[in-house]
Regions:
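Alpha-helical interface subdomain recognition
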Residues: 1-29, 35-45, 217-257
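Internal helix-loop-helix
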Residues: 24-81
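Well-ordered mid-protein domain cores that form the structural environment of catalytic cofactors
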Residues: 68-106
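A generic local secondary-structure boundary/capping motif
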Residues: 89, 98-100, 114-118, 137-142, ...
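Active-site glycine-rich loop that binds ribose-phosphate moieties when present
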Residues: 92-94, 130, 152-166
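A generic structural signal for beta-strand entry/edge sites
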Residues: 105-111, 125, 174
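DPxDG-like acidic metal-binding loop motif
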Residues: 113-157
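Glycine-rich beta->alpha junctions and the first turn(s) of the following alpha-helix
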Residues: 167-257
Length: 257
């Protein structure tokens, strides 16, 4: 299935649905919202197992699960609305200079473009960070996130841009999207600098560190799989101009051990 994921540039729908039904996108979600609320080391072990099979799938599991910890920062009713559906997945992309939110009565008018939103195909909601334009001049949330807010939007309200063709992570479906003058209610926004409602367990770890440790674990899992494949090949292949297996060559010992 890994070849199919890479070719199709997404996790197959039947597989992502099965993963969602079995709770693999709710591993770090609080138990109060129907999640597993795993301890961080246990989560990383699961990531490494997935990465050993397919790096893109593991990447999406990390991205989508780590974002779910923000459920403790956003309004409680909004978190319940989003994760009340078992197959709920929120994808987010880093802020860009092409985004802005203008305050209006009861919320914001949101416009912009965002990139690298991993898991776009199986996501149900979008989280778009944008600076608040308050009359003090233009802002760039990609450089200064002070005062920026994250807007939570059903996926069917954004314009999807198929621009993702990256070797190695092609299957993450990390596509771009655009929004033009969309009204977002205030209760579907939050400030990412807000402290979570409780900081026990994994929720006491900064979000940036959660992302970093998860993605580095994905890299380690892929590396382990690559080493195993190399060792397997070395035990079967006889290189040209040699009568001995590759595993007996000094160069193999130097590189692999």
């Amino acid at each position: 299935v890994s070849d199919q994921i890479d070719h199709d540039r997404q996790i197959p729908t039947n597989l992502s649905d099965e993963m969602a039904d079995k709770g693999f996108f709710r591993l770090l979600l609080p138990q109060s919202l129907g999640g597993s609320e795993l301890k961080h080391p246990d989560f990383l072990q699961i990531l490494e197992i997935f990465a050993d099979v397919d790096g893109s799938t593991a990447w999406c599991i990390n991205q989508n699960n780590v974002f779910s910890t923000n459920s403790l920062r956003m309004p409680e009713d909004t978190a319940k609305e989003i994760w009340g559906e078992q197959r709920a997945v929120v994808t987010n992309g880093p802020p860009t200079s092409l985004s802005q939110a203008i305050p209006v009565d009861g919320g914001y008018r949101l416009s912009g473009r965002w990139n690298f939103s991993s898991g776009m195909d199986h996501a149900t909601w979008i989280a778009a960070m944008a600076p608040i334009i308050d009359g003090t001049g233009p802002k760039d949330a990609s450089r200064d996130r002070t005062g920026a807010r994250i807007m939570l939007i059903p996926k069917d309200q954004v314009k999807f841009l198929d621009l993702w063709q990256v070797n190695g992570l092609r299957g993450t479906a990390s596509f771009s999207y655009e929004i033009e003058d969309l009204y977002v209610p205030m209760d579907h926004t939050y400030d990412p600098t807000w402290a979570p409602r409780h900081i026990t367990g994994v929720y006491g770890i900064p979000t940036t560190l959660l992302f970093a440790t998860g993605f580095s674990t994905v890299a380690l899992g892929v590396a382990r799989s690559s080493l195993d494949a190399a060792i397997s090949i070395a035990g079967e292949k006889i290189p040209g101009r040699s009568s001995n297996l590759l595993q007996s060559q000094p160069a193999t010992h130097r590189v692999i051990g």
